[in-house]
């Protein structure tokens, strides 16, 4: 009778586009959460958490049925009970749903939220881009003033500086509103239709359903057409022009670095007026190429003219937006993005309520922090190691640990080992300054051995004096 060949169990790895956050990296993630909480709370943003999955219809209605996210990137599934659900691909739709469902409409406005969490998109994984990814986000609902757009950008700037990131800048643009976009859409169609044969397959579809998304295509053969495409900034209505000019004045006053990118659009249909992206020039493997840098110039209205002598109407902008082109190639990696979404609340069943928000990618921030060699406060250095011998030593160990914890003394241990020699080797390897040794005799006598690792000198002390003596030795 032949011997049966043993079948090797199948091994597993993390799903494509996902990653483990390992113990040695946790300090970076804790740093992001800690700094974001402190800064966002200071600016009166309230923490909110929403489910990782929502009704599929929420994203169809909010994000837009013709967007790449809805058509290609959502993880959707049906339950046995017949529910159609989707893992959240972005945060804003869920925040607005929670705002409406939980009665925030009755609260004093604006309502300001911040959040952190995981999101999911079926994209092609690459460095800095995952299918499960984490974001830190801000949302403000209930204020149309451009100063709120500037506040979102300002708070993100403060956050990045607090992390120690030295260089970053914002790309900003206005995508207008329902009053000025139809005319611009017609101009785009006039420009792109004769070039339809040269477009990629996705852009041929966008030409029919969502022409503005043509400006966001990453295919090189489509990008070359963008150079001479009409600019929305030239076709903004007066209200949108004033709003955008006001935003730029706020950014100038705050000293926030920005570049006007008149071809910047976002991949979500709900955006109106302000849109922005945040970049760093640090080499993290990502690359953004802009054919021409657009320099914004705010030309003040001359002081002494008949027009200037007329009293200004409240809200009137005393500046003209002028765009100058300078050939330049910029390389960088996107850290985050955002914009205004004045129609989304009503689109999801609420009253007309202006809103603005944005989000930063946490994976990219962690990668950047590592690349820059930023010092991140970690856990307190372990300077004490606990060595036990016998069952009595093990049983008494938890009381010892708790006493050390209450006094802020970090301790290492290996309770599963019985050999004192092997435990002392681990203590030495860990870099601990002191070992506490608890054997059978010490456990019975309520004493403990304190050993200095550098000299090997040790003494027996009462457990009641352990904390006092430890603190004195650790101060040396």
Which role does the model predict for each range below?
Residues 2-476:
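TRNA-recognition modules of translation machinery and tRNA-sensing kinases, especially anticodon-binding
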């Amino acid at each position: 009778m032949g011997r049966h060949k043993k079948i090797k169990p199948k091994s597993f790895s993390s799903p494509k586009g996902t990653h483990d956050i390992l113990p040695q990296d946790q300090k970076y993630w804790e740093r992001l959460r800690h700094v974001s909480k402190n800064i966002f709370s200071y600016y009166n943003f309230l923490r909110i958490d929403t489910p990782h999955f929502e009704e599929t219809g929420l994203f169809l209605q909010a994000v837009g049925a013709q967007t790449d996210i809805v058509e290609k990137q959502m993880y959707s599934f049906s339950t046995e009970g017949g529910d159609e659900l989707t893992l959240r691909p972005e945060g804003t739709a869920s925040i607005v749903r929670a705002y409406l469902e939980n009665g925030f409409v009755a609260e004093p406005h604006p309502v300001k939220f911040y959040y952190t969490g995981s999101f999911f998109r079926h994209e092609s994984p690459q460095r800095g881009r995952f299918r499960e990814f984490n974001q830190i986000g801000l949302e403000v609902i209930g204020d149309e003033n451009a100063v709120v757009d500037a506040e979102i950008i300002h708070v993100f700037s403060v956050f990045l500086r607090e992390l120690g990131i030295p260089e970053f800048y914002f790309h900003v643009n206005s995508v207008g509103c329902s009053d000025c976009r139809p005319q611009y859409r017609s101009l785009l169609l006039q420009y792109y239709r004769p070039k339809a044969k040269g477009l990629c397959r996705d852009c041929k579809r966008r030409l029919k359903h969502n022409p503005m998304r043509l400006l966001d295509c990453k295919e090189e053969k489509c990008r070359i057409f963008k150079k001479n495409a009409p600019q929305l900034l030239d076709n903004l209505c007066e209200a949108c022009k004033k709003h955008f000019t006001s935003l730029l004045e706020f950014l100038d006053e705050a000293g926030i670095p920005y570049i006007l990118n008149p071809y910047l659009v976002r991949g979500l249909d709900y955006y109106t007026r302000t849109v922005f992206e945040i970049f760093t020039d640090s080499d993290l493997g990502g690359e953004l190429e802009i054919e021409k840098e657009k320099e914004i110039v705010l030309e003040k209205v001359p002081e002494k003219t008949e027009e200037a002598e007329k009293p200004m109407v409240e809200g009137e902008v005393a500046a003209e937006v002028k765009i100058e082109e300078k050939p330049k190639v910029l390389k960088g990696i996107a850290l985050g993005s955002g914009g205004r979404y004045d129609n989304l609340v009503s689109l999801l069943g609420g009253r007309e309520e202006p809103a603005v928000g944005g989000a930063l990618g946490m994976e990219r921030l962690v990668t950047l922090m590592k690349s820059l060699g930023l010092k991140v406060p970690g856990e307190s250095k372990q300077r004490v190691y606990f060595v036990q011998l016998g069952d009595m030593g093990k049983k008494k160990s938890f009381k010892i640990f708790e006493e050390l914890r209450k006094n802020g003394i970090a301790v290492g241990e290996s309770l599963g080992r019985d050999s004192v020699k092997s435990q002392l080797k681990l203590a030495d390897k860990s870099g601990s300054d002191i070992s506490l040794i608890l054997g059978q005799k010490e456990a019975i006598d309520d004493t403990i051995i304190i050993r200095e690792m550098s000299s090997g000198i040790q003494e027996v002390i009462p457990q009641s004096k352990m904390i006092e003596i430890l603190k004195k030795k650790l101060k040396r």
